[in-house]
A protein has these predicted regions:
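Beta-propeller folds
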Residues: 3-5, 9, 19-343, 350-352, ...
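Short coil/loop residues immediately preceding or within conserved phosphate-binding loops
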Residues: 26, 35, 56, 81, ...
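Conserved hydrophobic/aromatic "anchor" residues
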Residues: 40, 49, 86, 389, ...
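Non-catalytic accessory segments flanking enzyme active sites
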Residues: 192-195, 298, 307-407, 432-435, ...
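Flexible loop/turn segments at secondary-structure boundaries
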Residues: 259-263, 284-286, 303-305, 351-354, ...
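Cap/lid segment of the alpha/beta-hydrolase catalytic domain
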Residues: 375-491, 498-499, 533
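Active-site-proximal cap/loop segments of hydrolase catalytic domains
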Residues: 449-646
Length: 646
């Protein structure tokens, strides 16, 4: 494949690259990306792009051809645009979310998702679920698209009210005329997912009993719904992973019967029998056909390499040719045409950062479409290298170290940046936050501490009961390792994190003292009992997997366990000896804003240095450009004041 670079003119145009004599402006990293998603239409003739000007979002439809004309656009302004997908050649489905408390519902504000159909021929848009009686106009996840007798249909999971009780329900929506039909009501137990066949029939239900912690799989055969699998899963539903390889089977992740540390992918036939997909214990993500109708491959993280496996040999060879066209870069499939011959890929260059490219397998050509971050140049991208070290108890910890560009990697100031979750993980992909900090002269360590996902179930379980304990010292063990290597100056280290990473930052100031000069928590839990109690209230006192999950990870026997206070930064505020920065969005529905106000009050009462920055109208995920940049600017100012890079 020959690669040619070409600009991509959009309504919100790609900013030309600029060479910065000094560090790039923080806005290069902190504002919303130039492009958040690129989807190619089924016939490959058009592109649907979710673009931004750094704050406002817009859907732009353009012809795929170089210099192709504008086909349509929708301005979403400050609305949080979450996903874009084609439904044939004339319809684009857009998913958005907002933080709200609908009229008539009790409880705290929550994040609600809505889906729209944009007709690129008529230029009209329509809210899915808009006119359905006895149902909310929200969706519980992205729609599935199927064609029935040439007509595009959207299949969405919605909420149908029966006697004032909301019940998850599968709906079928005719995108040609808007007609909506309730396809499956889910039954008595909580049905949390469906698989839909290519011809638009429900194949399977995923069900989860929150009280008992039982997950079950129901498959629809000739005699109706039959429960074919039932598993105890106290920490949450196993769910469905889509349709299987033949388009009629269904997929679910299960613990391997022969090795409890492994999770494998089972493929269930309509008679309830199943096979285990070969090598699926190595899979991190699945690849379905462009229309979602069948499983065609998987993605595995092997070391730091993202490897694609396609079950069809020709498709596998085609992907190998795509990757070969971008030597030295990390290549990810973003979208592809129905015939799988035109692909949009995200190309993550360790030198230039991420960009989108269009690959035409028939023409054996590829061209760049647009950079992901406007104004980001080679001078603004720092080197990321994998590291590996032993924790104090001998457990191997992996992670990533970002080294500031142009600096000798010796005696550097360090920022420890633990990920959220905590059942999540960091990867070597471009990370705007760590790159921004590196651009200011800091080395940045992102460890995959125990409890992180992607390293086997035993590694996750190693984190149970280790909040503020071994999960915390896994971070400081990384500091000691880098200090021993001479890479960083152990007297110039701060810790910064969001969500669980925010908790880890506060625990670094209260529980694992003497390691850090300052700590910044963004939306971090601080009073763990209050945090879990607030989650439990959503279920009105009923047993539930959410409460069980948090108590398991925190190592508490129940909501009244006094050990929660010993690992809660709020209760340990008097031990703080370093400056603390707290940043929190007012619209956070995951870790409530009150968690940071409680911590600020406790620190002030103890006479400790603290600053609280409130992000107006911001959620847990830093979805807005202005407040995302406000967060980043506040963190950098705090670091430069308390841990100067020079």
């Amino acid at each position: 494949l020959a690669v040619t670079t070409a600009g991509f003119a959009m309504t919100t145009a790609v900013m030309p690259g600029a060479a910065w004599a000094e560090a790039p402006p923080l806005s290069v990293y902190g504002r919303l990306p130039n492009v958040e998603q690129v989807e190619i239409s089924p016939d490959g003739s058009k592109l649907a792009l979710s673009v931004t000007d750094g704050e406002n979002r817009m859907l732009v439809i353009r012809e795929t051809a170089e210099g192709g004309k504008l086909v349509g656009a929708m301005n979403f302004a400050s609305t949080k645009l979450r996903g874009v997908q084609w439904a044939g050649e004339e319809h684009v489905l857009v998913t958005t979310s907002s933080t709200a408390q609908p009229h008539g519902l009790t409880g705290p504000r929550q994040e609600y998702w809505m889906a729209f159909d944009y007709n690129i021929v008529t230029k009209k848009q329509r809210l899915l679920m808009e006119n359905e009686k006895e149902a909310m106009n929200v969706v519980l996840g992205a729609p599935d698209v199927r064609f029935i007798e040439g007509v595009p249909y959207a299949f969405v999971k919605g909420v149908h009210f029966v006697d004032n009780y909301g019940q998850n329900t599968l709906y079928r929506i005719n995108l040609k005329n808007g007609a909506t039909r309730m396809l499956d009501g889910g039954g008595d137990e909580d049905t949390d997912g469906w698989a839909v066949s290519l011809d638009g029939q429900p194949l399977a239900q995923s069900r989860y009993d929150e009280k008992k912690g039982d997950w079950s799989l129901r498959i629809k055969g000739d005699k109706g719904w039959v429960t074919t699998e039932r598993v105890v899963s106290t920490l949450g539903s196993l769910g469905l992973a889509g349709v299987g390889r033949d388009g009629r089977s269904v997929l679910s992740w299960m613990q391997d019967e022969g090795d409890e540390d492994k999770t494998v992918l089972r493929e269930y036939a309509q008679d309830g029998s199943y096979v285990v997909i070969p090598d699926s214990a190595k899979f991190d993500n699945l690849i379905h056909a462009p229309d979602g109708s069948s499983l065609v491959g998987a993605i595995s993280l092997v070391g730091d390499d993202r490897r694609y496996t396609f079950f069809d040999a020709k498709l596998h060879a085609s992907w190998a040719a795509v990757v070969k066209a971008f030597p030295g870069d990390r290549v990810s499939l973003a979208s592809w045409s129905a015939d799988k011959r035109q692909l949009v890929v995200e190309v993550d260059s360790p030198v230039m950062g991420p960009a989108y490219a269009l690959v035409d397998l028939n023409a054996k050509s590829a061209r760049f479409l647009t950079d992901v971050y406007r104004g980001l140049t080679e001078e603004g991208v720092s080197k990321v290298q994998p590291i590996k070290y032993k924790a104090a108890d001998g457990l191997e910890i992996t992670g990533y170290l970002t080294l500031p560009r142009g600096k000798d990697p010796k005696n550097l100031p360090l920022v420890v940046l633990p990920h959220g979750g905590p059942k999540s993980r960091d990867t070597p992909d471009f990370d705007w936050w760590s790159q921004a900090l590196a651009s200011r002269g800091y080395a940045v360590l992102r460890p995959n501490f125990r409890g992180s996902d992607g390293f086997g179930w035993a590694f996750v379980e190693a984190g149970f009961g280790q909040w503020g304990k071994a999960m915390q010292t896994d971070l400081s063990d990384g500091v000691r390792y880098l200090a021993k290597q001479g890479t960083i100056d152990p007297k110039r280290v701060c810790i910064v994190g969001a969500s669980y990473g925010g908790y880890a930052a506060l625990a670094g100031a209260t529980l694992d003292r003497g390691v850090y000069r300052c700590a910044a928590s963004i939306a971090g839990p601080a009073d763990l009992k209050r945090f879990v109690v607030d989650k439990d209230r959503l279920y009105e006192g009923r047993a539930n997997s959410t409460t069980r999950f948090w108590l398991e990870f925190m190592g508490a026997d129940g909501l009244k366990d006094p050990d929660l206070a010993t690992i809660s930064p709020v209760q340990q505020a008097g031990k703080v000896e370093i400056p603390v920065l707290l940043i929190h969005g007012k619209d956070d529905t995951v870790v409530p804003y009150v968690q940071s106000t409680l911590m600020a009050d406790a620190l002030k009462k103890a006479g400790k240095p603290v600053e609280l920055v409130t992000l107006p109208s911001e959620d847990h995920w830093l979805s807005r450009g202005a407040t995302r940049l406000q967060m980043l600017t506040s963190v950098v100012d705090f670091l430069e004041k308390n841990n100067p890079p020079n």
